[in-house]
Design a protein with these regions (language model features):
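PP2C/PPM-type serine/threonine phosphatase catalytic domain
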Residues: 1-143
Length: 143
């Protein structure tokens, strides 16, 4: 099995503005893609947390996501600490956090077994499409 992945930015944006993340775990035979919601706080951090968790565990349940919030919060706290150490005042970020504004992201993950059967998980406006190409004259969408 070969897996290749990359992320890119939207046409009118810069790469640094891309909030999407992916993770691949060859040993678990899993891959995940997460699309960070740009109107939220540090969506790239949340997308990274979600995609890495799915790739490493093969699932990302409601309970998992509740527990993962602390990992996101730790990353945000580290950012705030760096800002303060560099003499900047992250008051807007702190106000947003105090108002319980957080991050948002979709998650789309697939895990393959040894026979190359797969199980998927989707949350948000992402999707998984399987295309059957066994009949090259008429490929069809299976799922």
């Amino acid at each position: 099995m070969k897996v290749r992945a990359f992320i890119t930015h939207k046409l009118k944006e810069h790469y640094s503005e891309c909030q999407d993340r992916f993770a691949i775990n060859i040993d678990r035979r899993s891959v995940a893609v997460s699309d960070g919601m740009s109107q939220s706080i540090f969506p790239d951090y949340w997308a990274d947390v979600l995609s890495r968790f799915y790739a490493n565990n093969g699932h990302c349940t409601d309970e998992d996501r509740i527990n993962l919030c602390q990992e996101w919060q730790t990353k945000v706290d580290q950012y705030i600490d760096r800002e303060k150490q560099e003499g900047r005042n992250p008051w807007r970020l702190q106000n947003s956090l105090a108002s319980f504004n957080g991050a948002g992201a979709t998650i789309c993950g697939v895990t393959f077994d040894k026979a190359n059967h797969w199980a998927g998980h989707v949350l948000g406006d992402s999707c998984i499409i399987e295309i059957d190409t066994s009949n090259s004259d008429q490929p069809k969408v299976v799922k």
